From Swiss-Prot:
Zinc finger extent (B box-type): 152-192
Gene name linked to the record: gefO
UniProt keyword Metal-binding present: yes
Ranges annotated as biased composition (Polar residues): 590-604
Organism: Dictyostelium discoideum
Keyword Protease among record annotations: no
Protein name (database record): Ras guanine nucleotide exchange factor O
Lineage: Eukaryota, Amoebozoa, Evosea, Eumycetozoa, Dictyostelia
Length: 944
């Protein structure tokens, strides 16, 4: 078998790989060395790669030794053929051919390769010679010789007319030697012996038997499927009949329904036609009546000439009226009450028929001087039922005063509570003005306040007295002043016009409101956003009013009474006028004292609110809106100015009695605060005797470090600064100043309108993008380290910066840096022990476990200034809005329900907003801003 394989390999090496025949003019390819026939290479000249090794060849040369070998083989083959023909061996059977093949394959080493090929050539030629004789036998499938011999049970190849030599296991077919050298080259072969043939026959029988078994199964399945098809056909017929029946029934039903609906439509059409006919007749009657009224009105307009001729009478009335007003002002200390404009008109109307006739003809009926609402069918605020508001008692404070809380109510009742006589809840006013955007527009709120300002004719039906009317008017004025000064909403032009009209009316009855005039002035200057100017205190309003009174009456300066008030405005409210109210100030014992001159330590910024941030003392510079918690304490007359309300954050619940706490400081205490324009923070007035809050401590030093050791680099351009050149504490301080400036711009309306994180305002978007940019800046700076050692050094520096931020109470930037460090490639194993301890403590501090309980505890204990983590407040507001619906449906009767505004939801949300706003009151006044470092931080952070 070994000799056979070698001989076949040798024969294959003498065969061309293209034509699969012995070489004819063999040529060798350069450089691979494979040989092919010259004709084959010429025919396939377009192929530049070798057929066998696929290597590109450059040229080919004749292979003379191989050509000589082929010639020798051909010559030997011709000699053998001639010898076979001469000896008459045409009658040899197939056994001689097989024996020759086996002798050639299994011959000894003495046989030469040429002799083997010659013998194979002889057997091949003999095979071709016998093919003509055995063609019929081969085609009929008969065997040559006896069936007992292994070599006798062989057939012939139909292609080459040679005896089968072996069985190709890959192709599953018998092959002859020529097939073995050509198409079945290098395939797995099985010799054709009796045992192998028997084994294959057994395998084929098993396969045939399995096929027969499967065929029987398929026949059985076909029978079953035919039965199923017959069953499905019968079922299909039944379903078809049932569907046809249902369709016919449905058609009948629809036909009857169509007939019924057509009858109904015709009846409705007839009824509507009759109704429209009746309405048209009614409208025609009304039109005729209106034409009559128009004719009567034309007659009345003709009488206007008579009114114009009575100018002397009008001037006489106005002179009398002015004289009465002047006399009333002189006698206000004796009467105890300032006469009202409407009261004077009613007096003259009742006592002078001619004047009454003139007023009715020119000004119209006084009772009709009400504000026309745009909402048709809306209930007037004076006609709203009393039960449309729910108020519950919350607690009794230390002074024995009962405190109430509004749960829900209608819009009219909620606005009415803003200016109830003998009752003023400063907490309620703050909550309402803080959250009214969620259920009411600014224009509608102003309309309702004007509607409340307009007193109805029937005073007794509403339980009103002159004192209560005056108190309602004063509280409406105070609410408007507080609304414009402290909350500074953006008003549209319609609302601005309403303010202007109301201020003109207010000027005719009392005095104009300076805040509204400033608002109108800003709107006339075409400012981009209609906001209030720098807030004026009630003392500035006093100065305006007092100057006007001095011009009209020189004797009014000597008539300034002093009034002592209690916890609420009761009997002494009759003695308070708009002029002395604006001059009021709180004494040390908690009483309200009216004085002629403004307080000595008065500052215009005292009445700013904490949402406005620090403001300049110049009235020309606009300020962002802030919220003051006790700005109406002067009007309320409360002897305790410390803000104690349910709106206080939980951290103040245990320290309500501690008046020295910076978070519970009174409104008056903030008068020592002054705006520092350099760093947008609050400086402490020297009159306070020292700083109001201690400076934030640092892990390196408790004082502000001297930066002279790197001042030469800092004072240079920020482009020359490098991260490693700047001190960690200085980076933390300048970053805190920038963050506090962005934090101070947040307004209450921003927190009310962006909690869904889809429609964020620019201020919220800015601070959230800043948080992301800081985190990205830290990650980028760490990655820029050339190797692990440099990256570890950068991480250690950022850890120190984070610790300084913690001591500066800048928790927002601290969280951004922690997020970047946690996702960096530098692990705690690479850091020094001190840095590992610091980063572990910081991670525990800002951990989100138990809803940031550790952070909330630290925040409650820290002293301002502070930059809290903003995302927590946004999440708290979102949770409150999900748990508390905007409106509440209450069953007012057995079969009637009514929807009210859920004011509890607004109170809870205002807690969060006021808690956040409390940190905007106090800035980092002790930190020196360095422009180059801030520019470096802004450039490297914002560019990301």
């Amino acid at each position: 078998m070994t000799t056979n394989s070698k001989s076949l390999n040798l024969l294959q090496s003498l065969t061309c790989g293209i034509c699969q025949n012995l070489f004819k003019d063999p040529n060798t390819l350069i450089p691979c060395g494979h040989a092919f026939c010259l004709d084959c290479l010429t025919t396939n000249a377009s192929i530049k790669n070798c057929i066998q090794c696929k290597v590109e060849y450059t040229t080919y040369i004749p292979n003379h030794p191989l050509k000589q070998m082929i010639d020798c083989l051909d010559q030997s083959s011709n000699n053998n053929n001639s010898n076979n023909n001469s000896n008459g061996e045409n009658t040899n059977n197939n056994n001689n051919i097989i024996n020759n093949e086996r002798s050639s394959f299994n011959g000894s080493n003495s046989n030469s390769i040429i002799g083997f090929i010659e013998g194979l050539s002889d057997s091949t030629s003999n095979g071709r010679r016998f093919s003509q004789q055995d063609g019929l036998r081969y085609s009929s499938g008969l065997l040559d010789g006896s069936n007992s011999g292994g070599s006798n049970n062989i057939r012939y190849c139909m292609e080459h007319y040679e005896h089968y030599y072996a069985f190709c296991n890959d192709c599953q077919a018998p092959v002859c030697p020529s097939c073995l050298l050509t198409t079945h080259n290098r395939h797995g072969m099985i010799p054709l012996t009796k045992d192998s043939i028997a084994t294959k026959m057994k395998e084929y029988r098993d396969i045939v038997q399995s096929f027969k078994t499967k065929m029987s199964q398929y026949k059985d399945n076909i029978t079953l499927y035919q039965k199923e098809i017959e069953l499905l056909d019968s079922t299909f017929l039944q379903c078809k009949q049932s569907i046809q029946l249902m369709i016919s029934n449905l058609h009948k039903v629809l036909k009857s329904r169509e007939t019924y609906l057509l009858k109904e439509i015709s009846s409705i059409h007839y009824a509507s036609h009759m109704e429209l006919t009746d309405r048209s007749s009614t409208l025609e009657n009304e039109i005729s009546e209106m034409e009559k009224l128009i004719g009567n009105g034309t007659d009345k307009f003709k009488d206007a000439t008579e009114i114009l001729n009575n100018q002397n009478l009008k001037f006489e009335f106005l002179e009398q009226f002015h004289h009465s007003r002047t006399q009333s002002k002189k006698n206000q200390n004796q009467d105890g009450l300032k006469p009202l404009f409407k009261t004077d008109l009613l007096f003259y109307k009742a006592n002078n028929e001619r004047v009454t006739e003139m007023i009715n003809g020119t000004l119209g009926n006084i009772s009709l001087l009400t504000f026309p609402l745009d909402d048709i069918g809306e209930v007037n605020i004076w006609d709203e039922p009393k039960e449309n508001i729910c108020i519950e008692k919350v607690r009794t404070n230390s002074n024995g005063i009962e405190e109430f809380e509004v749960k829900y109510g209608s819009l009219n009742k909620l606005i009415e509570r803003l200016c109830l006589p003998n009752c003023y809840d400063d907490n309620y006013v703050n909550i309402f003005l803080l959250t009214y955007h969620s259920f009411c527009s600014s224009k509608k709120l102003l309309k309702k306040l004007i509607e409340r300002f307009t007193i109805p004719e029937d005073l007794e039906a509403h339980g009103l007295t002159l004192a209560s009317i005056h108190e309602i008017h004063m509280k409406i004025r105070s609410v408007l002043v507080k609304w414009i000064n402290e909350y500074s909403p953006k008003f549209d032009q319609d609302t601005i016009h309403l303010f202007q009209n109301f201020n003109c009316r207010m000027q005719s009855e009392y005095t104009s409101i300076q805040e509204i005039e400033n608002l109108l002035l800003n709107s006339n200057e075409n400012s981009p956003s209609i906001t209030s100017s720098q807030s004026l205190s009630s003392q500035s309003l006093y100065s305006q009013t007092n100057n006007n009174n001095n011009n009209n009456n020189n004797n009014s300066n000597n008539l300034q009474p002093t009034i002592q008030t209690n916890q609420t405005l009761s009997s002494n409210i009759n003695n308070i006028t708009i002029s002395n109210l604006n001059n009021s100030n709180l004494t040390n014992n908690g009483t309200c004292k009216i004085q002629n001159s403004p307080p000595k330590n008065y500052q215009q910024s005292n009445y700013s609110s904490i949402f406005n941030g620090p403001s300049s003392s110049s009235s020309s510079s606009p300020s962002s809106p802030i919220l003051s918690l006790n700005s109406l304490a002067l009007i309320n007359g409360n002897d305790n100015l410390v803000f104690e309300s349910p709106l206080n954050s939980p951290r103040n619940n245990n320290n309500n009695n501690n008046n020295n706490s910076p978070r519970s400081s009174s409104f008056g205490a903030s008068s020592a605060l002054k705006f520092n324009s350099n760093n947008n923070s609050l400086n402490i007035n020297s009159n306070m005797g020292g700083p109001y809050f201690p400076s934030p401590s640092s892990p390196t030093t408790n004082n502000i470090p001297n930066i002279n050791h790197f001042s030469s680099r800092i004072l240079s351009s920020s482009k020359n600064l490098e991260f490693n050149d700047i001190d960690e504490f200085e980076i933390a301080k300048q970053l805190t100043l920038i963050e506090f400036e962005n934090f101070g711009r947040i307004k209450p309306i921003d927190l009310l309108t962006c909690v869904d994180l889809k429609h964020k305002t620019p201020h919220i978007t800015n601070i959230m993008e800043r948080f992301h940019n800081i985190s990205t800046w830290v990650s980028t700076t760490i990655v820029r380290g050339e190797n692990l050692k440099n990256r570890v050094k950068i991480v250690n520096k950022f850890i120190k910066i984070a610790e300084h931020l913690k001591n500066l109470n800048n928790f927002n930037s601290l969280t951004a840096i922690l997020v970047a460090i946690q996702r960096s490639t530098v692990t705690k194993k690479d850091l020094v022990k001190q840095s590992v301890k610091i980063i572990t403590d910081l991670e525990k501090l800002m951990s989100s476990d138990d809803s940031y309980s550790t952070y909330r505890t630290r925040l409650a204990q820290c002293s301002p200034p502070c930059v809290p983590y903003i995302s927590i407040y946004l999440q708290d507001i979102m949770d409150l809005e999900k748990k508390n619906p905007s409106n509440i449906i209450v069953q007012t009767s057995s079969n009637k329900t009514q929807e009210f505004i859920n004011f509890t939801r607004r109170s809870l949300i205002s807690k969060v907003i006021l808690d956040l706003a409390s940190y905007q009151r106090f800035g980092y006044s002790t930190i020196l801003p360095i422009s180059n470092i801030q520019e470096y931080l802004n450039v490297h952070i914002d560019e990301l």
